Amino acid sequence: MNPNTTAQSSSPFMLELTGKPFAFQGYVHGFHQPTLRYKLHHAVVNPPNLSDIDAFFLKELGVYSDFDHSGDEDAPLLVRLKNWPSALLNQANHPVFEPARISKFEGKNPNHYLIFQPCMDHDAALSSVVFVIRLLKLAFQENAVEGLMEVKKSFSSFQKNLAFTGLQGFNQKYILKAASELGIQWFRLKYTVFQLGAGCNARWLESTFTDATPVISSTLVRHKPSAAHILHISGLPVAKHFLVRNKDEAVRQAEELGYPVVIKPADLDGGRGVKTNLRTAESVSRAFLAVSKFSQQVLVEKHVPGRDYRIQVVNGEVLGILEKVPGGVIGNGKDSVQILLERQNQERETAENDLDYPLQKMAFDEEAKELLFDQHLDSDSVPADGQRVRLRGACNIASGGVPISVPLHQVHPDNISLALRAARVLRLDVAGIDLLIPDIEHSWLEIGASICEVNAKPQMVRSLYKPLLATMFKGGNGRIPVVIIVEAEFTTENISFSIQRECLAKGINTGLVSGKEVWTGKECVNKVCSGPFDGARMLSLDTSVEAMILHVTDSQVMRKGWPVEWCDVLLVGRGPQDLQNSAYSPIEWLSFAETICPQHVIMEEAEQEVYNHATSLFNSQKLLSAPCWAGNEERTATVMTAVNVVAGQKKSPATQGSF
């Protein structure tokens, strides 16, 4: 790095966090996930050239930002603060699906900015922001090299700390991304479990485990001999196998089965420890010792020739089929196997195949050497142009394989039926059926096949996550009708109870949050609720709730964010009870409410300025005005308008029940 290009100016500068960052647990400003808001003092004269810092971020730290860096050449530091924390979070499996947003203070503090950073974990988001500020400050140092090297040394520890609270695997990240794109609300329940949707239409997921996945079934399929037994007595094809306790027993059973054989852990999935196509007693002994390091339960299985396919089944429907090509390299007629593998591993650090599936690197290990020997090759051999050299016995993607999509119309119907039956007899709502068959275009009844594994929590390619959710939510978005009332009064005679009574009369089990009370139908289930946000979460978790009424009587939602992303009817009265003592004006409340896109807005008579602001936010088709809500015809009309919207939404296909 050339330090002279980094510090172009010795002019004073300021790049500091000011005040206390604010954690929104709910939804604000149109974001589809929690948000960290922080205030930044940014005053820079003649900003330095950041090309070296950019290169360091990408090449030395290996962090790629897919958000746009252009568009604000006058404030390059802000552009990076808008994008780089999100890149760090995504790298650590903290999903961020949209860039941060920046707004500038007007008036007394022209160099102060508010930045809204979307996140999953607020502490992780703040750590990423602080890290980026530290890195950007180095651009102003006369000799930044030493500082950058210190950053690089500490980066591994920083990454581990971020990853500790991140998601495991990649299923969950892309499920949440698909949910956001489909308009399905999500929030984190605990650790790796998320809720999608609300009330009676909500679903829980942990990766591709769902709230409908039976514990018995998932336990059975995790133990391969048990799953194979169930499949066998159901008339489905599986390979003959034996559990073995030592290498001598492994050799004896292999000889009884007849070579070649496969040795694998009986209680692990994902292709871990699998040794395939073993043809000698010596190779079986070595394989047993290797596999026993992964598990004390070792399985010897008859090798079944054929191509390896993963058939994805969700709720009795095949969503997609992949052929799993075993890991290897393709020759170019110039380079050795060793060089080809090194180059491929380097490319796979960030590469994904055309199915957007993360590709895994491969080590040049004993398995690779043995397979090369079987192909009459070694690490120095130069394969011909286009020649495929196999370096892995198992076809699993996790061990370096490559998935290739197979169009459903090319698959014989008998093979589709086979996969559906396998998932059905094992009682699995979501399943990955691994099928070995010579040609999937021909019936397994004619050419033979074997189900080698069933996975109750299968990894999927990105193209399947939206179909997965569409199937789970039956084409809907998991929402229930929501009425939000912004009004100080919260007696039992207020309008929220009137709306609830009418909804109940129509057979809609309606939840209500009003003051400190939470109701599900006619039952008060909580009298010490701290506010509408917490009350709404209670109702969202209750699968009996078919519609929700939130009576906002204080400014808790301004502090925590909205508990829902949508609103069917917004009723705006005199504002929350603490409005007079808060920093929030009626106009700010309207702007805050506009971010949840209410479909119908009913306003009590307001000052002209407030009403004019409402008309600028909500189009004339959405906005209605009622002179008064208490004791007159307008109150009744207001109540029935809200009730009719709720009843109409309840019948809408988008909000039909998920189960």
What are these regions (language model features)?
Residues 116-256, 269, 491:
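Conserved N-proximal alpha/beta basic substrate-recognition cap immediately N-terminal to
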Residues 340-402:
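Extended, charge-rich helix/loop segments that form flexible
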Residues 1-180, 317-320, 325-332, 336-339, ...:
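ATP-dependent carboxylate activation and anion-phosphoryl transfer catalytic cores
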Residues 649-658:
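Positively charged N-terminal leader segments that act as targeting/secretion signals
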Residues 186, 238, 261, 298, ...:
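Hydrophobic anchor at the start of a short beta-strand
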Residues 204-362, 413, 447:
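Active-site nucleotide/adenylate-binding loops and adjacent lid/helix of ATP-dependent enzymes
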Residues 501-595, 599-616, 621-648:
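ATP-dependent carboxylate-amine ligase catalytic core
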Residues 482-502:
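Glycine-rich phosphate-binding P-loop
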